[in-house]
Amino acid sequence: MTTPKKAAPEPHAEASRIREGLPFPLGATRDGLGVNFALFSANATKVELCIFDDAGEVELERIELPEYTDEIYHGYLPDAHPGLIYGYRVYGPYDPANGHRFNHNKLLIDPYAKQLVGELKWSEALFGYTIGHPDADLSFDERDSAPFVPKCKVIDPAHTWGHDHRVSVPWDKTIIYETHVRGISMRHPSVPENVRGTFAGLMVDDVLEHIRKLGVSSVELLPIHAFVNDQHLLHKGMTNYWGYNSIAFFAPDPRYLASGKIAEFKEMVAHLHEANLEVILDVVYNHTAEGNEQGPTLSMRGIDNVSYYRLMPEDKRFYINDSGTGNTLDLSHPCVLQMVTDSLRYWASEMHVDGFRFDLATILGRYHDGFDERHSFLVACRQDPVLRQVKMIAEPWDCGPGGYQVGNFPPGWVEWNDKFRDTVRAFWKGDDGQLADFASRMTASGEMFNQRGRRPYASLNFITAHDGFTLNDLVSYNDKHNEANDENNQDGSNNNLSWNHGVEGPTDDPEINELRQRQMRNFFATLLLSQGTPMLVAGDEFARTQEGNNNAYCQDSEIGWVNWDLSEDGKALLKFVKRLIKLRLTYPILRRGRFVVGNYNEDIGVKDVTWLAPDGTEMSQEQWGEGHGRCLGILLDGRAQETGIRRKGADATLLLVVNAHHDIVNFTLPQVPDGGHWTCMIDTNEPSIRGQERFEFDHEYSVTGRSLLLFELQHEEDE
């Protein structure tokens, strides 16, 4: 922690320099002749605008905002231009017992700042109270924090977008590719060193070409909002690599700007759009980097703590901690709700972002008594003319009471389905009693999502995510190995449903390695042949490893970065994944617009889905209840497609066969009305199979243990 120096004499300015301005829009807004400043605070008594030199190091002026309208302090500074560096000092009561933590000695970041300059330098002066004082956070610290806080920068929003526009991929054709701005390019040989780990690095042709050729539709970036590195991590020589510690919801993190200019983000978006790829941002509106009552005063805490945060009703000194990080933003407050929706509209309208994934999204729908799908935030998103046009993805849980809300978000939202992850992992690991749940996961978990006109794509299916094992590690480790995090391997989940197949970590055993490769193919085939919206993680497509680390949040290192030096097995897996994605996009029956529920269509005499036992007959209730059942056929009859439109793949009939037994199971290929024969399109045991061989009805196909097959029904006229 840096020791603060004695504060310099306070700078001042003539009151006549600033005009009254307007209370809207919030933030610093240039009109060509000057800049309007507007800051919400319901409980402050005075606000000073602090002007700094171009380096953000010397405070030149303090100017009191002259007007207060509808809880907005505002003023207009003539002749101010883009590039102006500023911050705020906010006056008011320091009364933590009643939720107030005003301290004008602390320079504060504008919640609406569009760009930050400088890094946060940890110092005792950042805290509104005196560290080590007997009264703890009830004490009052008089040291100036300005030398240690990032400053705000007025931007020129003008940008020549040309013909750029949102890609607007339909949900049924959406395949999400989760990645990290820094992690995807740090080890890529084609990315120049000076732009590695930045938005410019993601624009490099070879990086985009890999993503485009893979066949995914949407790139989801881990948080790019300006964030704070935790003090305890810096002490250990680490950083908050993932960035789930936001401090400015309108500003990209300066570390991701190789050029130092906001235009770099816009150029990245345009490049991805040109490659026909959507840009989805992982956003963290559930908490801020200010932490609990013992945290620093950086922005909202010092602007109006009682308005921005949810506080304990019986003692407002303390924070409700539904985020698990120390504080929780209060989106039931109209001005906090406005800030979040303004931020979303800014990224969608000004930055051309195509969608958002909301971290711990249950918090965003919480009132004091719990989650409410009619929460003002959720309603606002559905009604907003901009936000209702972009993709909205919820991580539907948080750390508070009743936080698990999978399936309970309103229509218009897509939700991470952790039950898909857990069931599919358990099934391919060979756990008992998984068959019925596995069948449900393959068909978009209708028991959770088939309501109120929601579509199968509402279930966002994933095997792995940034949080947890990579796919390679999932089949290579029984236990986490987070020693590099320097937390005695106590961090990260112990419930991974992983299996190392006989040896912990890398091995030279060819049988184990072959089985691991097959299991990765099983996972990918399950993910990409299931109903719902699939998401894969960058590097999984070629078997990236994190060396058993399942919590790489602090690993801004080779552990956390994607390794582009592909092994032969990695190249083979990549080729297989590309085939699966192409098949998914070719056959609409794999991404139906309605849930398949086993309904019988009397007009054509078929069910939309039929569940088959290994003997080729329909599964009985008794067979569903058998705990040791691990083999299942899933017959998707294309004649039951709801549209009736005939186009290539639209009316294909497909049969998926899964066998999680360790031994071969003979599976009888079923008869289908109107005749035909079966062609094997995918066999995870023989990845080279491409439909070369035909099989008649009632043929007993020997399904290798721990493998998945995909058959297509063909007729003579199809050949």
Say what each PLM segment does:
Residues 352, 367, 373-538, 542-543, ...:
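Conserved alpha/beta catalytic core and glycan-binding cleft of carbohydrate-active enzymes
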Residues 2-177, 182, 199, 507, ...:
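Carbohydrate-interacting/catalytic domains
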Residues 41, 67-69, 79-81, 92, ...:
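Short, flexible loop/turn elements at secondary-structure junctions
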Residues 36-38, 174-175, 217-220, 276-278, ...:
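Beta-sheet entry/capping signal
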Residues 84, 92-94, 183-184, 188, ...:
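A generic secondary-structure signal for well-formed alpha-helical elements
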Residues 39, 88, 179, 221, ...:
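Conserved, mostly hydrophobic/aromatic
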